[in-house]
Amino acid sequence: MIFGKVRLHPNICSIQEILDTDLIDMLMFSVNPAYDYNHGEYAFGGVDERAEVYKRCEKLGVGISVMKPFSGGQLLSDKTSPFGKALTQYQCIKYALDKPGVLTVLPGAKSVAEIDFLLKYYEQSEAALDYSIIGSFAPPEASGKCVYCNHCEPCPAGIDIGAVNKFYDLATIGDDMAREHYLALEKNASDCISCGHCNSRCPFSVDQMSRMQDIKDYFG
């Protein structure tokens, strides 16, 4: 085992190679909608490539500590956001925390007052944390892919749709624990009544009714 080693990773391929070594316990990585959708200096990799890193870290038990959740502050203003629409700090933090493998988010702060403001994240309503607006400016390749935002909630059947999708995505890449977590859910894809409520609300145009059938068939 190698202790106390810190190295830089210049791109997505390097991260995958590092994960291949099975030597790391933690990965510091910049996670935010801009970088995930290929906007910004540190936007390494495409939508699918970055998603694979998140899922693989979860599978391997490598915790992701998030840097630059606000894309250097650019996402907080209509004028500087690459999407032309601002997000709040709380939306950005929630976005990062919803990614597989993410354990901590480390936003920058210049004062105690800013830290106090960020800590109010824990006092926010679900509506204040809802970042589904990014569906309106996500790139075409992101369409049809669940990001676990749960904007489709509440499910009339009581299914935690985001969790069901996350555990399915993790299970399909070989995460054995994901199956256990899925089966431990109070409600799962088998409880779907195909009412279409989720499809009508999804900002990413995910066909959740079809997904639920696929997930049901996968887990048996």
Protein language model annotation of sequence segments:
Residues L23, D48-G220:
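Structured C-terminal cap/extension of enzyme domains
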Residues M1-S65, F70:
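Glycine/proline-rich, positively charged
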